[in-house]
Amino acid sequence: MKIRIATLKDLDSILRIYEHARSFMASHGNPTQWGTTYPPVDMIEHDIRMGNAYVCEENNRVIAVFYYAFENDVTYTTIYDGNWLNDAPYGVVHRIASDGTVKGAASFCLSWAFSQCHNLKIDTHQDNLVMQSVLAKLDFKKCGTILTEDGSSRIAYQKQDSK
């Protein structure tokens, strides 16, 4: 597997992956996190234009997609029922999804993102047990709860370099 920055030529593949992910989430007890329309096409296109959309390829085929940036995420400013592991600059991952054809694609993407910054934050819905399991296996620590821009709560995770 390899990671590269997404281009607009990847849009059809990305849309298929997100459609698969929404269906998978709904069938695994998490129908509300992304509903039937998230992420919207204009958000995906914006991520691509800004250089923050990444794809994971296997045998020259796009199998996963995610948002990665080294930035302060406004929704991570306030954390409830806990604390972040540190106050150092961090990378963030959002909107990670795979097409389900290659086992471990999400873990590969998250490991790549961590290798870029060594201090990574991510959040997920309380019903997204699959992602919670992936994050636990990769030694992300549950830090508390954050609120998204629409006010819904998410479980906040962080992984920091052990040095």
Question: Where do the model's predicted regions map?
Answer:
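A short beta-loop-alpha structural element at the N-terminal edge
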Residues: 2-16
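A short helix-loop-beta-strand connector motif used in the catalytic cores of GNAT acetyltransferases and
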Residues: 43-55, 72-74
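Conserved GNAT acetyl-CoA-binding A-motif
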Residues: 116-127
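Conserved acyl-donor/pantetheine-binding loop and adjacent beta-alpha core of acyl/acetyltransferases
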Residues: 67-101
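Conserved catalytic-core motifs of GNAT/GCN5-like acyltransferases
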Residues: 123, 141-155
